[in-house]
Amino acid sequence: GPSNLGSSTQRHPIRPISEIGELEANRRARWALNLDDPFSSRIYFDLNRKADGKWAVEKVTLPPVVEEGKVPPRAIFVDALGITDSFLNAALKQEFDDAKSVVDPEKVSDAKIAGLCIIFEEAKYQLRNQKPLRAMFSSETTAGFKANVEDETGERAAEFGLTVQREDSTQPWRVTEVNLDQLLTDYATRIAGGDVHFTPLVKNPAGGDTLILYFGFDENGLTPRTERQLDIVASLLKTDPSKKLTLSGHTDALGSDDYNKGLSKNRAIAVKEYLLSVGVPLTQMIAQAEGEAKPRLPNVLEDGEDNPSGRRANRRTEIYLDF
C-alpha cells in the first residue's frame, strides 16, 4: 500500500490519497496519490470493480513531465470526469481562466462561472472526501455528474449537477451545464440567514445570468464581501480587454425619486471606482442609475405592509456581463 513508499516521496500532509470521482456509477472510479503539490503532482489510479465486488487497478497515470519554462497542462485527463474535475478545482481556487478553458462558452456564461467562484469562496466550500463526483449518466457524447461539496467543518453538505458533452469521440469534452439551484439554496441558508433572494447570481430578464452585489439600507459603501466578489469580476474582465460590463445601480422605494436616483448612481459609481482601483480600465465599464424603477421584488406586500426582505433584494448593483 501507499505506506510502503520510500520517505523520499513527499505526500500531501492532509490527505495522501484522494478520491477524484466515479467514471461509471458504482463500477469504475479514479483515485489519486498526492505527491508534494496536491494538485499538479499526482499519480492517478483508475479502478474497476470486478464481479466479486473487489476493486482492481485498471490504469495508472503518472504526472506529466514539464520542461523548464513550459506551462503544465491545465487538465491531465481529457475524459468526461477529468474535464469536470478540472473545472471544479479551478472554480474552487477562483481561477476563472482555467475554469473557462473547459466550458462551452455558448452554454455556460462567464457570469455563471464567476458566480460559482464567488459562492465557493464565500461559503468556503470544498469537494467532499467521499464520492466528490458521482457519475449520474454517461454515453458516447454526454455525461452527467453530481458534485458533492461541504463546508470547512464538514458538517454542512450541498450538491449540484454538471453536464459535459462532446460532438463525437474526436472532439474535446466541455462543460455545458452547471445547475446551481440546490447550491444557491444551501448558500442562502448559511450565508444570508435563509434569505434566498440574497444570492450573487440571478437570471437576467434579457437572457443569460447576472451577478448582483447588495448594499445596506441608505448606504453606497462597499463591504469586504462585495470587494471580494469584485476581485473575481476584475480577474474575469482582465482576461479579455474587449469585454464590457454594465453596472446598474438600484434602490428600494423609500425616499424621493430624486434621492433614490442619486443613491443608485452612487452605488454604481462605488463599484466602478473599486474596479478601477484594481486595474480594470474605464473603457470596459458602463454605469447606469435606475433608482427605484426596476425592483427585483415588491417593496410592499399585497396588504400594503412594508416588505423588508423585498427592499433588501432591491438595494443592489447589478453587473451585466455583456460579452
Name every feature range the model reports, one short phrase each.
Residues L81-N89, D97, S101, R228-S235, ...:
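Solvent-exposed, polar/charged alpha-helical surfaces in well-ordered, non-transmembrane soluble domains
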Residues A56-N89:
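Short, low-complexity N-terminal intrinsically disordered segments enriched in polar/charged residues
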Residues V149-E159, Q165-K244:
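Periplasmic peptidoglycan-binding/tethering modules of Gram-negative envelope proteins
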Residues S3-K50, T61-P64, A111-G161:
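Surface-exposed, charged secondary-structure patches
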Residues N26-R28, S40-R42, E140-G144, A157-E159, ...:
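Extracytoplasmic
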Residues T251-F323:
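Periplasmic OmpA-like peptidoglycan-binding domain that tethers envelope proteins to the cell wall
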Residues D46, A56-V60, K146, G161-T163, ...:
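Soluble periplasmic/extracytoplasmic beta-strand elements of cell-envelope proteins
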Residues G1-N4, A90-K112:
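Short, well-ordered alpha-helical segments enriched in acidic and aromatic residues
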